Amino acid sequence: MSFNFCLPNLSFRSSCSSRPCVPSSCCGTTLPGACNIPASVGSCNWFCEGSFNGNEKETMQFLNDRLASYLEKVRQLERENAELERRILERSQQQEPLVCPNYQSYFRTIEELQQKILCGKSENARLVVQIDNAKLASDDFRTKYETEVSLRQLVEADLNGLRRILDELTLCKSDLEARVESLKEELICLKQNHEQEVNTLRSQLGDRLNVEVDAAPTVDLNHVLNETRAQYEALVETNRRDVEEWYIRQTEELNKQVVSSSEQLQSCQAEIIELRRTVNALEVELQAQHNLRDSLENTLTETEARYSCQLNQVQSLIVSVESQLAEIRSDLERQNQEYQVLLDVRARLECEINTYRGLLDSEDCKLPCNPCATTNTCGKPIGPCISNPCVSRTRCGPCNTFVH
């Protein structure tokens, strides 16, 4: 914005003491524009020498000074406006455009690390499953070992019971054998006593007496003993067979019970192992799901933190840009206000200049001479002032001044 005013006549007349006279219609009023120009500017006090009084000179000097101050202020505002435009241009050129940082490499690294973490977690889960399977196998073998140990203990208990029975049978056999031996000894003693008695009787009777007695035939003790032995042996054999049959039946029943119990135990153990495997598999899956959830929560937390940081950066950038925009808007509003003020000042100055120009042009025809000038605007010589302003003189057509 520039104000180029061409005021040759005004500058020329401000350098001398002459001043045009304002028409009588302007007397007692102020000139256009909010400059509060004194009303004495329009007073038409004319002296025959063409000079003005001191009040009019001071008013003219005041107006010229105000015009010069306005022009100086306009130039200063133009310089400030140019400086502000230059600063805005430099700032707009220096300010780098907003470029979002490229995080693709970091994202790729994060994805690779996440893949490695997932692979490690799957490998750990596989190893955990293998360890659990080994534990289950060891538990199975331990259960089988305990089962075999319990079966061995049962068989040993049965053997101990059978040994006790065998010992009892052995004792019973020994008792029976002792009884047989005692009976044999008693039989031998009886035979010896009988023979002694028979011999004694024979020796007493001699040959004199031959008594025949119809008596029952004598019993063969050997035969009786043999029969008794046979009976006892048959009884022992019968008892032994009965005991063996009872032992076999008890053993078979126990074996059946042990087999059924072992089958039930194996089925229960298999079911328990299957349930343990299922529980372990479910626990492993649950642990994997927990790990996946923790990983996803950590990823979500990291993503939220990263995006919150980016959001804070963007918000701070937005706040900075908004502050810069507000500053630019305030500068623009201030410059607009200054521009409006300058436009008003320009309008007032143009109005005043036009008024001054009209006044000067209207008064050029009334001035007899200019004591400070020797030529007019056309370059023609101006005649000297005369004391009688009523004498007719020749005027210059283009500039409307008197010549001689």
From Swiss-Prot:
- Organism, scientific name: Ovis aries
Q: Name one GO cellular component term.
A: intermediate filament
Sum up the protein's function in the record's words: Wool microfibrillar keratin.
Q: Where is this region: Linker 1?
A: 92-102
Name the UniProt record assigns to this protein: Keratin, type I microfibrillar, 47.6 kDa
Q: Where is the IF rod domain?
A: 56-367
**Annotated stretches, region: Coil 1A:** 57-91
> MF terms per GO, please?
structural molecule activity
Report further notes.
There are two types of cytoskeletal and microfibrillar keratin: I (acidic; 40-55 kDa) and II (neutral to basic; 56-70 kDa).
For region Head, the annotated ranges are 1-56
Which residue stretches belong to region Tail? Answer: 364-404
Region feature (Linker 12) = 204-219
Gene3D superfamilies attached to this UniProt entry: 1.20.5.170, Single helix bin, Vasodilator-stimulated phosphoprotein
- Keywords per UniProt: Coiled coil, Intermediate filament, Keratin
Any Pfam family from its record, for instance, is Filament
Q: Which InterPro entries match?
A: IF_conserved, IF_rod_dom, Keratin_I
Q: Where is this region: Coil 1B?
A: 103-203
Q: Name one GO biological process term.
A: epithelial cell differentiation
The region called Coil 2 is annotated at 220-363
Kindly list the residues the record flags as site (Stutter): A305
> Which protein family is it in?
Belongs to the intermediate filament family.
